[in-house]
UniProtKB/Swiss-Prot annotation:
Compartments where located: Nucleus
Region (Disordered): 166-186, 237-280, 370-409
GO molecular function, one term: DNA-binding transcription factor activity, RNA polymerase II-specific
The name this protein goes by in its record: Dachshund homolog 2
Subunit structure as annotated in this protein's UniProt entry: Interacts with SIX6 and EYA2.
Coiled-coil zones: 459-554
Gene encoding the protein: DACH2
Length: 599
């Protein structure tokens, strides 16, 4: 990588000379591939300002380590510093430019650096300021690391190899499968199948099954199962009759996502119409027997069944069915699709067996006589009774390839009275619409002796299944309405219970307030009684003291009486009465106190 001659950008410890236009609110690297937007005017202004600052400051910093150069790396301009003779580049800048789309984040890069034994250099404050001014790092970042070119190339190679390994592992997990089991389908594969299925096979799903947002998961799963069951049924029927001994794998359908062309070619090579032998002659004879139909190709039901096998448009699903609304539940749709798959597989097996049966080739005995050496397998088949169709039993044995055994077999077939279906003219067949045409594998329409009974039966069964699904949907809707009514009644009951509880709570709160008021009154009366009791106790003490004094005065009177002083007796005549009155008042107070305590 050639280093381009770029201007040297230096800085000092003061950042006053940096223009304000270099600091941006938005990050410069919005995408991994976007280079830093450095115009020549910005670089020149930055250089002039920094040279003026360095001339005025007198070399206050180490200019050797703070000289920033814009070097060319993988076609991008990257900021670099020259330290100890090594060129170091900004690690966050090269991460945004080259590594962001390869790894999960910058922490993954640091983990890889530890594993690779690479030690990045931590930037100084001046270097961080320079890188921030150039826009190499975010405006709010105050830390940065530098890495050499050699270490970056090692890191870039490791990240690229790791991503390639992840992609190869993911592809192997999608494409590989164990015998007898389909490959694991990831979410992305299912979404890709859903996207391609609507374009590659337009008539495979009814428009009623496709919601406004896309194909539902149940419908997608049933459609994939339908394709796989068809392919497996045809491989089972054609396994013994194929000449080259090649069998198609059921998993090819899943590995070839949306590839309708390759799967069509493969089915065309293995279809009973392209098998070598008498059937190929039947096809050409049928083609030769139609001189100019007038540009309106026809298809009988057997050919339509074969088209179903080759994953083409379903004749009964090309138009939206009136019994299939969009709002059907997924369970009913899945059940109906499962039954349709089963019935369709049975119809395809019966159609293929009729193609291989000897009675379908009875009208072409001339072709058999012309090529008597070609092998003609004739498996035995017993058809079940179908409504609206003729009941016939076919009995045949294995026919050898020698001419004598062939003639003997033809004689036995002539002896057995079997009603051979009459070949109908092409005008009596079902005609395609003007917008429809045969695929590339069919050069012209085919004629086979078959009736519409199988398709009618299949359509009748499908209609019945759709009716059942619709009835189930209606029943579920009724159940939902009934549940809604029950929930409403229960809600009303809960509301009534809640209102009753609220009333009871209000009554209880009111009674609580009344009880609190009564309690306050009782406390007030109790306080008054205690005060009265204290007052009475004090009076009692006073009365007792007075009684004591009265007793002492009585003893003094007696002494005076003994001495014979009459005046003192006259003065003290009223003292016994007074003491009796005082005792009576004391008893009254005690009775009042007892009454208060009892109350």
């Amino acid at each position: 990588m050639a280093v381009s001659a770029s201007p040297v950008i230096s800085a000092t410890s003061s950042g006053a000379g940096v223009p304000g236009g270099l600091f941006r609110a938005e990050p410069l690297y919005s995408t991994p591939r976007e280079p830093p937007r450095l115009t020549p005017n910005m670089i020149n202004s930055f250089v002039v300002n920094n040279h003026s600052n360095s001339a005025g400051g007198g070399g206050r910093g180490n200019t050797n380590t703070n000289e920033c150069r814009m070097v060319d790396m993988h076609g991008m301009k990257v900021a670099s510093f020259l330290m100890d003779g090594q060129e170091l580049i900004c690690l966050p800048q090269v991460f945004d430019l080259f590594l962001k789309h390869l790894v999960g984040g910058l922490h993954t890069v640091y983990t890889k650096l530890k594993r690779l034994d690479i030690s990045p250099v931590v930037c100084t404050v001046e270097q961080v300021r320079i890188l921030r001014g150039l826009g190499a790092i975010q405006p709010g970042v105050n830390r940065c690391k530098l890495i050499t070119r050699k270490d970056f190339e090692t890191l870039f190679t490791d990240c690229t190899n790791a991503r390639r390994k992840r992609q190869m592992t993911r592809k192997q997990a999608v494409n590989s499968s164990r015998p007898g089991r389909p490959p694991k389908r990831s979410l992305g594969v299912l979404q890709e199948n859903a996207r391609l299925l609507t374009h590659a096979v337009p008539g495979l799903l009814s428009p009623g099954l496709i919601t406004p947002t896309g194909i539902t998961a149940a419908a997608m799963a049933e459609a994939m199962k339908l394709q796989k069951m068809k392919l497996m049924a045809m491989n089972t029927l054609q396994g013994n009759g194929s000449q080259n001994g090649t069998e198609s794998e059921p998993d090819d359908l899943n590995s070839n996502t949306g590839g309708s062309e390759s799967s069509w070619d493969k089915d065309k090579m293995q279809s009973p119409f392209a098998a070598p032998g008498p059937q190929h002659g039947i096809a050409h004879a049928a083609l030769a027997g139609q001189p100019g139909i007038g540009g309106a190709p026809t298809l009988n039901p057997l050919q339509q069944n074969h088209l179903l096998t080759n994953r083409l448009d379903l004749p009964f699903m090309m138009m939206p069915h009136p019994l299939l609304p969009v709002s059907l539940p997924p369970a009913s749709v899945a059940m109906a699709m499962n039954q349709m798959n089963h019935l369709n597989t049975i119809a395809n097996m019966a159609a293929a067996a009729q193609i291989h049966s000897p009675l379908s080739r009875a009208g072409t005995s001339v072709i058999k006589e012309r090529i008597p050496e070609s092998p003609s397998p004739a498996p035995s088949l017993e058809e079940n009774h179908r409504p609206g169709s003729q009941t016939s039993s076919h009995t045949s044995s294995s026919v050898s390839s020698s001419p004598s055994q062939m003639d003997h077999h033809l004689e036995r077939m002539e002896e057995v009275p079997v009603q051979i279906p009459i070949m109908k003219s092409p005008l009596d067949k079902i005609q395609l619409t003007p917008g429809q045409a045969l695929p590339a594998g069919f050069p012209g329409p085919f004629i086979f002796a078959d009736s519409l009974s199988s398709v009618e039966t299949l359509l009748t069964n499908i209609q019945g299944l759709l009716k059942v699904a619709l009835d189930n949907a209606r029943i579920q809707e009724k159940q939902i309405q009934q549940e809604k009514k029950e929930l409403r009644l229960e809600l009303y009951r809960e509301r009534e219970i809640r209102e009753n509880l609220e009333r009871q709570l209000a009554v209880e709160l009111q009674s609580r307030t009344t009880m609190q008021k009564r309690l306050k009154k009782e406390k007030k009366t109790k306080r008054k009684l205690q005060e009265a009791l204290e007052f009475e106790s004090k009076r009692r003490e006073q009365v007792e003291q007075a009684l004591k004094q009265a007793t002492t005065s009585d003893s003094g009177l007696r002494m005076l009486k003994d001495t014979g002083i009459p005046d003192i007796e006259i003065e003290n005549n009223g003292t016994p009465h007074d003491s009796a009155a005082m005792q009576g008042g004391n008893y009254y107070c005690l009775e009042m106190a007892q009454q208060l305590y009892s109350a």
